[in-house]
From Swiss-Prot:
GO terms for molecular function: carbohydrate transmembrane transporter activity. It is a multi-pass membrane protein. It comes from Erwinia tasmaniensis (strain DSM 17950 / CFBP 7177 / CIP 109463 / NCPPB 4357 / Et1/99). This is Probable sugar efflux transporter. The keyword Plastid does not apply. GO terms for cellular component: plasma membrane. The gene is sotB.
Amino acid sequence: MQTTPVSRKTAWLRVLMLAIAAFIFNTTEFVPVGLLSDIGSSFSMQTAQVGLMLTIYAWVVALMSLPMMLLTRNVERRMLLMIIFVMFVASHALSSVAWDFTTLLISRIGIALSHAIFWSITASLAIRVAPQGKKTQALSMMATGTALAMVLGLPIGRMIGQLLGWRITFAVIGAVAFVTMLLLLKLLPKLPSEHTGSLKSVPMLFRRPALVALYLLIAITVTAHYTAYSYIEPFIQSVAGLSGGFTTFLLLIFGAAGIVGSVLFSIYGNKFPATFLLAAIGLITLSMMCLYVSATHTLAVSTLCVIWGIAVMVMGLAVQVRVLALAPDATDVAMSLLSGIYNIGIGAGALLGGQVSLHLNMASVGYVGGAIGILSLLWCAWSMKRHPQLRLNG
């Protein structure tokens, strides 16, 4: 709840700025996917080796989300956001002047630490500053920020990287983050920490079987997705033999499809909660299984990316709403665990995709991701049967 009454316009403006912040944080997480080849060329490395930066980033977030959230649980939230942004901007400044791959990794670790705290607190903050009764819409706006990171942030970052160099991409992200920090400082009220939970909340949460089943579902599904998605740029160029410009276009429509998924979820997610989650995981799996056979057909692979992008967004929103519903008494701890587990999946998928491309071939990443996706779909169906509350959004 907000401590003082504000107009609906102001409330929505605050949510919008948090969504813009989400856009920035997700852009910097995802943009290396579109720059792997360029970064590899700068340091004379293979793309699979450069892909290690995706795994390290994700696993730093995974390992540090809960400890950083607990360490800062009593810090007033606006002040904490400012600290996060200062670390974020400084780390991007280092990325923009990185003289070797080790320096780049160090800068990415700094960004990952700020990311770890940001996603532990932001969903609950968006709900707190949103107009009364608009929780779902606030989360949907945050999700739109995430989707825009793929539809605008990632392809624009890739275009800047191709035109001016990947270092300039990181410099621009840092500059935009600095402006956003100043606007958030002006717009947000003081937000005392509340309902964060404590270290004691962790075993309590893991004694909730439905929540544990959901966390495992998230880990499996995200691992499956990122096994293929992490290497979509080199896959399209080296396996499909399509141009760099068309690769940028595919990244663009993948992200645009995520916005469609966000809108669909906000309208129909509460009406068909179980169907939406099962269908999303099924479509993610099908998309990866069909990636290789559709790769050389521009219309087919474009259609596939639209379906895949919609499904990934719906899946992400569906699990987030369920986590908040299953842990209303410790939202920040539950969300930090979600962020950590999600990033375990990102790191595992990026690592597995890299190993597949090195030891099998790049063409196989979709099939391996799809095989894990089938396991995820089976686990989802079983979990919903075993834990009926997972069939609902809350």
